[in-house]
């Protein structure tokens, strides 16, 4: 917390042994940052601007500069993986993608990822939550990670009546019949 990279003040930050004593922490982690405040009224109407890459594309177009392309990975090699039990049960949802990851042994995010999330107003939680939040900020695509031991049958649907739902931030929200929910079978687990 003292060096301005996290709200976490619970303990001592570990720095690898290859960093010499007395090294400025700014040379170890990406702490210094430039903040652009963009008053963009079209953000809500332009989903392509919801992420950092979309904003960068807009800036590149306005400045007449080339945009560094994203590295694209061929996902077809994952086509043979076992399918996740997922069904879209409402035409309001046009697409929902998911993949199951196993054998994740690391739970703590890299420090630079936690720093970037902190600068974007988000707190680090764990590796998978931080990764989905990081990608959401980068690409503008909301994501969520579920524990496959607890969520077995993903269903995307609406409910006939409104109900209360407590989100991860602890806020109880009123969900109306027009809101798509991600469910474990018939039990809502996310909006």
What are these regions (language model features)?
Residues 63, 67-164, 171, 182-187:
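Glycine/proline-enriched, intrinsically flexible loops and inter-domain linkers
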Residues 167-169, 177-178:
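Short beta-alpha junctions and helix-cap segments that line functional grooves
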Residues 33, 151, 178:
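Active-site lining segments that contact anionic ligands and/or coordinate catalytic metals
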Residues 1, 125, 177-180:
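Loop/turn positions that initiate beta-strands
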Residues 1-76, 190-191:
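Phosphate-backbone binding interfaces of nucleic-acid-interacting proteins
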């Amino acid at each position: 917390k003292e060096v301005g990279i996290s709200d976490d003040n619970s303990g001592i930050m570990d720095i690898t042994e290859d960093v010499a004593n007395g090294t400025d922490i700014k040379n170890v982690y990406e702490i210094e940052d430039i903040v652009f405040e963009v008053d963009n009224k079209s953000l809500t109407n332009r989903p392509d601007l919801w992420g950092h890459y979309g904003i960068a594309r807009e800036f590149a177009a306005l400045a007449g500069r080339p945009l560094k392309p994203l590295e694209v990975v061929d996902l077809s090699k994952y086509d043979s993986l076992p399918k996740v039990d997922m069904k879209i049960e409402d035409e309001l949802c046009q697409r929902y993608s998911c993949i199951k990851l196993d054998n994740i042994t690391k739970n703590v995010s890299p420090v630079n990822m936690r720093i970037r999330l902190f600068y974007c107003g988000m707190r680090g939680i764990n590796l998978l939550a931080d990764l989905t939040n990081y990608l959401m900020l980068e690409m503008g695509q909301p994501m969520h990670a579920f524990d496959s031991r607890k969520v077995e049958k993903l269903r995307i649907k609406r409910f006939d009546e409104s109900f209360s739902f407590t989100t991860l931030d602890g806020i109880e929200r009123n969900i109306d019949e027009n809101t798509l929910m991600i469910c474990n079978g018939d039990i809502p687990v996310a909006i």
